[in-house]
């Protein structure tokens, strides 16, 4: 019997819990959750899976082989210290928080450590889970975590030094994409008599179809543009504007988000 604990129950924790239960990677009575606020999200889960336990970690942490910390970054170290009396070298602790590096996590415990950055698109089983394992973590624990994540996402192990940039392309990307396409839709509304609902509907289906084509036909962005934009045509005209204007926007996106990651790490470091 493999028992799994979740500490914190936001949208990512809910996605992980539901996917593990849905794919029968764990039984209801093997899942333990601690959350400070037992809100609608947790009540909905327990309505669907009444045998899930929602209790303080002190009641179950010493029985769990895998514990996922799903609290905000500035609460991770505090949570690690609460866990300390209940875990050992055989425990595998996973943090899904941005800005809390392995070195700070490892300093708080003798348990094995991994970092996972999940994506909300894994709700549709179309996301990527970024994974960084501690060098000291046993191979079988790495494999088991990767196996669990792979039932609802594509698992990609990467260098921790690349994790923040990669997170912008996976975990944050749905938000960035939504912001970009919202502005495109609103521009269409300003330049026509289309309703916002019509513009959004057209774009959502175009976005879905483009992603499907890119994956199923293994096409690059460049190939897609070549297929759509004829030389001297209308699409090419619009693409030229985007190529001229957007690089500076995205450079600023990365500059500001990477600085935010750095500030988070500095703040967490002051807690140790």
Curated annotation (Swiss-Prot):
Annotated catalysed reactions: L-proline + NADP(+) = (S)-1-pyrroline-5-carboxylate + NADPH + 2 H(+); L-proline + NAD(+) = (S)-1-pyrroline-5-carboxylate + NADH + 2 H(+)
Oxidoreductase listed as a keyword: yes
UniProt EC number: 1.5.1.2
Transmembrane recorded as keyword: no
Enzyme class: oxidoreductase
Cellular compartments per GO CC: cytoplasm
Pathway, per record: Amino-acid biosynthesis; L-proline biosynthesis; L-proline from L-glutamate 5-semialdehyde: step 1/1
Alphabetical keyword list: Amino-acid biosynthesis, Cytoplasm, NADP, Oxidoreductase, Proline biosynthesis
InterPro entries: 6-PGluconate_DH-like_C_sf, NAD(P)-bd_dom_sf, P5C_Rdtase_cat_N, P5CR_dimer, Pyrroline-COOH_reductase
GO-annotated biological processes: L-proline biosynthetic process
Primary location group: cytoplasm
Highest taxon of source: Bacteria
Knockout mutant characteristics: The proG proH proI triple mutant is auxotrophic for proline.
Compartments (UniProt record): Cytoplasm
One Gene Ontology term of the molecular function aspect: pyrroline-5-carboxylate reductase activity
Pfam families documented for this protein: F420_oxidored, P5CR_dimer
Function, as annotated: Catalyzes the reduction of 1-pyrroline-5-carboxylate (PCA) to L-proline.
Similarity remark: Belongs to the pyrroline-5-carboxylate reductase family.
Protein name in UniProt: Pyrroline-5-carboxylate reductase 3
Taxonomic source organism: Bacillus subtilis (strain 168)
């Amino acid at each position: 019997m493999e028992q799994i604990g979740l500490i914190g129950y936001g949208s990512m924790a809910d996605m992980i819990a539901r996917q593990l239960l849905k794919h029968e990677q764990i039984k209801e009575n093997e899942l333990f959750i601690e959350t400070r606020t037992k809100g609608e999200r947790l009540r909905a889960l327990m309505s669907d899976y009444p045998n899930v336990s929602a209790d303080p970690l002190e009641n179950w942490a010493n029985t769990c082989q895998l514990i996922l910390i799903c609290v905000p970054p500035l609460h991770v170290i505090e949570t690690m210290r609460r866990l300390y009396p209940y875990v050992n070298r055989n425990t595998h602790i996973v943090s899904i928080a941005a800005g809390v590096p392995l070195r700070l996590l490892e300093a708080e415990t003798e348990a094995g450590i991994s970092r996972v950055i999940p994506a909300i698109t894994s709700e549709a089983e179309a996301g990527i889970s970024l994974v960084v394992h501690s060098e000291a973590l046993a191979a079988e624990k790495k494999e088991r975590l990767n196996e669990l994540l792979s039932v609802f996402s594509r698992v990609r192990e990467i260098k921790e030094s690349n994790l923040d940039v990669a997170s912008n392309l996976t975990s944050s990307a749905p938000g960035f994409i939504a912001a970009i396409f919202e502005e495109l839709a609103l521009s269409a509304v300003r330049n026509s008599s289309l309703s916002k609902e019509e513009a959004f509907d057209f774009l959502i289906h175009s976005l879905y179809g483009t992603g499907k084509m890119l994956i199923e036909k293994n096409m690059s962005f460049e190939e897609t543009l070549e297929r759509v934009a004829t030389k001297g045509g209308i699409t090419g005209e619009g693409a030229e504007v985007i190529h001229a204007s957007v690089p500076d926007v995205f450079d600023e996106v990365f500059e500001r988000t990477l600085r935010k990651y750095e500030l988070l790490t500095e703040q967490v470091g002051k807690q140790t």
